Structure formats: structure tokens, C-alpha cells
Amino acid sequence: MYYSEKLEEEILDLPDGLLARYLRLTDLMLKFGSNLGLPHTKPLESGLFELRVKGKEGIARVFFCTKIGKKIIMLHSFIKKSQKTPKKELQIAKSRMKEVIKNDSF
């Protein structure tokens, strides 16, 4: 499940190699659960996780959280351009996660 249609479109617009890897990893998450472990998923803080997508075109990150019933909600994505995750990108994911927790429609 996606936080918004816009986010789903952004993810589907990833370069082909990154998109293929993303789809493979999300398929594994649906089959085995959201915690695939490193190098695929990494817990960040208080229920926020990152899906680590690597391909020939670069590195993408997709932040996600889970809700009761094992529902996985993709919150935010970006193409990584530096070693460290930009605080702005992390803040967007945290803000959206708070909204998801408060809103029962997800």
C-alpha cells in the first residue's frame, strides 16, 4: 500500500533497474514479511524502516512502516546521492508515518 497515488507514480518512474529491484524486494516482503534484514531492509527508529534498493542506475531508498495485520505502507522514496540519508527525506517519512498512525483509513 502507498501513502499516496503520487508516491506510487514516483516509485513506478524509477529507472528500470531500480524499479525491477524494488518490485523484487516488495514481492519478497509480501512473501516473508517486511523485515528482510540487511542489505535489503533496515530499521531506522520507532517503527520506521527503509527498503534499500540498489541497481546499475544508482541507489534508491523507500521508507515504510507497518500496521497491525502486517500491512506494509510505503511512505516516501528518493534517489540517494550521498552516503548519508538527507534529514529532509527522513523528516518527510516521519511526518507521513505520524499521519498513517493517526488515520485509520490506511
Residue ranges and their predicted role:
Residues 75:
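ATP-dependent carboxylate-activation loops
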Residues 62-63:
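Hydrophobic/aromatic beta-strand elements that line small-molecule binding cavities or substrate pockets
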